[in-house]
């Protein structure tokens, strides 16, 4: 390749990167120092394949703390009567890999991440753990570049809807306990959890299936066995609750139909008696 062609290719790549960063910054609402944003988007698989570049792991560590602080402060102020244990469970319902990944998907964050070929080939751009880690790294980058107030504003914008939804649904409670109470009410038996783990020791991913009466009603993934089981319990709770609501709705409609039919029959009988 000639030097001119190489220069043209490099310039085109740089222009595409800059355009991509501008798009992401528009979604975030902040313009960040270029090198800092690049680092926040650099997964270690890309760094290792390109000569040991800096990864986003330190920024992820920082962003995790910023996210935790802002969410904890919000919960503390909005739920003055909740004890520490329930506040912790509410926070866990918001700050977990699945919730972070969903927020990341809303930003289409996966399309901006710098991934190695191996991760790229195995669907890494939509992998919950990678999306969650990258989102935390981006929050860390906003904190370093713009300060705590800006990072806090970003966290509020992205996570306040989740906090409100979780509070309204009672997600601050223990999902495993909620599932056990629901299955007892529905006469389904006691839930059990089958957990598998994948990945190296320093980065394990746990997958849990919530089973009741031999039937799997929900699955979940997380960085710990506890998180995976909670996610699976939530998924199963929603599935069983939805099915129960549908049955109740069908029963109510059937009862209404029967009542209307009985009313019509009575009306016909009354009309017959009157004509006689």
Swiss-Prot record:
Cellular component, GO annotation: cytoplasm
The RNase III domain, residue ranges: 19-147
Stretches with biased composition (Low complexity): 230-242, 250-276
UniProt region (Disordered), positions on chain: 217-276
Example GO BP: tRNA processing
Cofactor names: Mg(2+)
Protein name: Ribonuclease 3
């Amino acid at each position: 390749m000639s030097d001119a062609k190489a220069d043209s290719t490099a310039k085109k790549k740089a222009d595409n990167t800059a355009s991509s960063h501008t798009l992401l910054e528009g979604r975030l609402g902040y313009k960040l120092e270029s090198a800092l944003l690049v680092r926040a988007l650099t997964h270690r698989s890309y760094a290792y394949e390109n000569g040991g570049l800096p990864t986003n792991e330190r920024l992820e560590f920082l962003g995790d703390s910023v996210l935790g602080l802002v969410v904890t402060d919000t919960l503390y102020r909005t739920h003055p009567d909740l004890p520490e244990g329930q506040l912790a469970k509410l926070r866990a319902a918001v700050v977990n890999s699945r919730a972070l990944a969903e927020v990341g998907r809303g930003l289409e964050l996966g399309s901006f991440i710098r991934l190695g070929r191996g991760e790229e080939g195995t669907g890494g751009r939509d992998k919950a753990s990678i999306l969650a880690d990258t989102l935390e790294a981006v929050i860390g980058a906003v904190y370093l570049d713009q300060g705590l107030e800006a990072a806090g504003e970003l966290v509020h914008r992205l996570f306040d809807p989740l906090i409100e939804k979780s509070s309204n649904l009672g997600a601050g409670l223990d999902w495993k306990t909620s599932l056990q109470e629901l299955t007892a009410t529905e006469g389904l038996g006691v839930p059990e959890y089958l957990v598998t783990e994948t990945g190296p020791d320093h980065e394990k991913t746990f997958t849990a299936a919530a089973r009741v009466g031999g039937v799997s009603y929900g699955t979940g993934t997380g960085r710990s066995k506890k998180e995976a089981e909670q996610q699976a319990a939530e998924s199963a709770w929603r599935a069983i609750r939805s099915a129960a609501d549908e049955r109740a709705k069908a029963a109510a409609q059937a009862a209404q139909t029967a009542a209307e039919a009985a009313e019509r029959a009575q009306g016909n009988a009354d009309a017959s008696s009157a004509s006689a």
